Design a protein with these regions (language model features):
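Alpha-solenoid helical repeat scaffolds
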Residues: 17-18, 67-68, 75-82, 108, ...
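Residues that mark the junctions of alpha-helical repeat units in TPR/alpha-solenoid scaffolds
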Residues: 12, 16-19, 48, 70, ...
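A conserved position within tetratricopeptide repeats
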Residues: 3-6, 56-64, 68-71, 118, ...
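Short helix-capping/linker turns of helical repeat alpha-solenoids
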Residues: 8-13, 26, 59, 69, ...
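Short coil/turn linking the two alpha-helices of tandem helical-hairpin repeats
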Residues: 20, 25-35, 85, 90-101, ...
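TPR/TPR-like (Sel1-like) alpha-helical repeat modules
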Residues: 43-56, 102-126, 130-134, 140-150
Length: 158
């Protein structure tokens, strides 16, 4: 049914998002033990990403990606970006390479998509953007190591 709607209204972003969500739910409900969403045929996964990317493209302002958008477009953008970021994180979680991208590249894509969703009003995505940001993780690791070394030094002196 959604295929017909999209064929008749190819510029309707919401239909692309709905089809992607339904497709993901259908895939996840049919998984066997030990499988993950990326166990589905690659064409189905590509279709998911295509629908989400198309919804983003249709919802962004033509003049500039940073131009103001309507409330409807903001809702479409935050939903599509969050959904795509979720898929990138699932790929990281399941150690799946997408289009030859490894864990760090996928985490970076997820972080960027979460940041984009946050820009359009998704507060959970804002938090996830910070959590998945590879640079923030690296800085956090450096600070933790420095604190650990400082504590070792104090313990040795004390």
């Amino acid at each position: 049914q959604l295929d017909k709607t999209i064929s008749a209204n190819p510029h309707y972003a919401s239909a692309h998002i709905n089809r992607a969500m339904l497709q993901r739910m259908r895939i996840e409900s049919s998984l066997q033990e030990g499988q993950n969403i990326f166990s589905a045929p690659s064409q189905e996964i590509e279709d998911l990403f295509h629908d989400l990317s198309r919804a983003i493209h249709l919802s962004l302002p033509a003049s500039s990606p940073t131009a103001p958008v309507s409330e409807y477009a903001a809702r479409m953008l935050r939903t599509a970006y969050s959904h795509r970021a979720y898929l990138y994180l699932k790929a990281v979680e399941t150690e799946t390479q997408l289009k030859g991208l490894g864990k760090s590249e996928l985490e970076e894509l997820a972080s960027k998509d979460f940041a984009s969703a946050a820009r359009y009003g998704d507060e959970v995505a804002r938090e996830m953007s910070v959590r998945t940001n590879p640079y923030a993780k690296m800085c956090g690791a450096i600070v933790r190591n420095a604190l650990r070394e400082e504590q070792k030094g104090e313990a040795a002196r004390g």
